[in-house]
From Swiss-Prot:
Family: Belongs to the archaeal Rpo10/eukaryotic RPB10 RNA polymerase subunit family.
Name by which UniProt lists this protein: DNA-directed RNA polymerase subunit Rpo10
Cofactor note: Binds 1 zinc ion.
Lineage: Archaea, Nanobdellota, Candidatus Nanoarchaeia, Nanoarchaeales, Nanoarchaeaceae
EC number of this enzyme: 2.7.7.6
Requisite cofactors: Zn(2+)
Keyword Cytoplasm annotated: yes
GO terms under biological process: DNA-templated transcription
Subcellular location: Cytoplasm
GO cellular component, as recorded: cytoplasm; DNA-directed RNA polymerase complex
Quaternary context: Part of the RNA polymerase complex.
Source species: Nanoarchaeum equitans (strain Kin4-M)
Signal sequence, start to end: none
Gene3D superfamilies listed in its UniProt record: Homeodomain-like (1.10.10.60)
Length: 65
């Protein structure tokens, strides 16, 4: 799956927040604090970023048949 571009529920654009969210969480920062700092208040938008799993780099390693 590619990083989320919009919230699946309300449609709010989230793509511009993905890189900062992902970098800060990977550095060990608390996801709740990161989401609060990014200004995401709606639980649907928070869920979209929290549950996103980017598997494209893994899939890209396989050769076409």
């Amino acid at each position: 799956m590619l990083p989320p571009i919009r919230c699946f529920s309300c449609g709010k654009p989230l793509g511009h927040l993905w890189e900062e969210f992902n970098e800060r969480v990977n550095k060990g920062e608390d996801p709740k604090k990161v989401l609060d700092d990014l200004g995401l208040e709606r639980y649907c938008c928070r869920r979209t970023l929290l549950s996103a799993v980017v598997v494209f780099p893994v899939i890209a390693k396989f050769k076409k048949v």
